[in-house]
């Protein structure tokens, strides 16, 4: 399966931030494992009664679902060569980054208690899932090179999961 070459925005930055570079892979593996560990910790806390949520409620949170998608996308992108990824990979990567940005914004604007955004004495999983991954998702999308140019219509497809989740929560 052939893919198109990466977009040459700036040759020097394109080579430095190529997803197949070893240091980019290491960062992505650590981020992916940290993200999935934070979600697993949330589910473990729910299963053992350490949180107010049940396991089903914890698995139903958009934050946890979006972070699982993001963690898997980051890990798969880290362990597989860019040339072996399918042509739709950038769309999935873009959707995961979009979900992370939405998670961060909704947390910051609607969910966090007043004054909580300035505190760092929170549960590490909370910090990872609501602060680190949203910022990392945005930075990764902006800086890691893409395999093809993105049309303006593609982000509309990324809305499918959040809209389905919204309908699910309303029903």
Model-predicted segments: where are they?
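Aromatic-rich, lipid-facing transmembrane alpha helices and their immediate juxtamembrane interface loops
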Residues: 2-171
């Amino acid at each position: 399966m052939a893919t198109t070459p990466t977009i040459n925005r700036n040759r020097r930055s394109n080579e430095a931030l190529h997803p197949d570079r070893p240091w980019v892979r290491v960062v992505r593996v650590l981020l992916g494992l940290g993200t999935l560990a934070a979600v697993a910790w949330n589910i473990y806390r729910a299963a053992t009664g350490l949180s107010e949520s049940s396991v089903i409620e914890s698995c139903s949170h958009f934050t946890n679902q979006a972070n699982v998608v993001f963690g898997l996308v980051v890990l798969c992108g880290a362990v597989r060569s860019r040339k072996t990824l399918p042509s739709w990979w950038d769309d999935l990567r873009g959707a995961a980054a979009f979900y992370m940005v939405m998670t961060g914004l909704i947390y910051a604007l609607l969910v966090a208690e007043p004054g909580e955004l300035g505190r760092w004495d929170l549960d590490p999983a909370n910090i990872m899932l609501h602060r680190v991954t949203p910022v990392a998702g945005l930075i990764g999308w902006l800086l890691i090179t893409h395999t093809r140019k993105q049309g303006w219509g593609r982000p509309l497809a990324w809305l499918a999961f959040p809209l389905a989740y919204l309908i699910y929560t309303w029903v």
